[in-house]
Amino acid sequence: MEQNENTLSVLKIAPGQHPQQVEIDNDLKALQQAVGGSIGASYPFEDPVAIVYNDDGKLMGLPLNRALRDENGQMYDAVAGDFLVVGLGEEDFASLTPEMAQKYEQLFHQPEAFLKLGNRLLVLPMPDEPPTEKPRTKTPAEHDR
């Protein structure tokens, strides 16, 4: 994708969907529009990237999107609603490099479903295609009376 300083090449990740590489304007209004409200930013990775999310997403009841996991694979938080993975420049957000875009597309590729069990939250990968119903191989039993 062609980049200039007025646009950012980022990953947009919506609940239940695969990440999409998109171009957005490099301004606050465009970031807010992309996540549906006030933005928050988190820097959970060692790479020069940030997650830009709706700061009020959980309070608004937006659907949980993806789990954030520590280095041991344990979930420590979940992002609600649409979020962006953006690059970091010296003082501001920047376009993702092709390598970072590929890395984080793979990390967040599989949509996740969240299931509350008591006071625990279970995170399950969503299948790419809905399961198809298998044809029945046996006919219903007939009863003689």
Q: Which sequence ranges carry the predicted segments?
A:
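Non-Sec secretion/translocation targeting segments of pathogen effectors
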Residues: 132-145
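N-terminal nucleophile
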Residues: 2-131
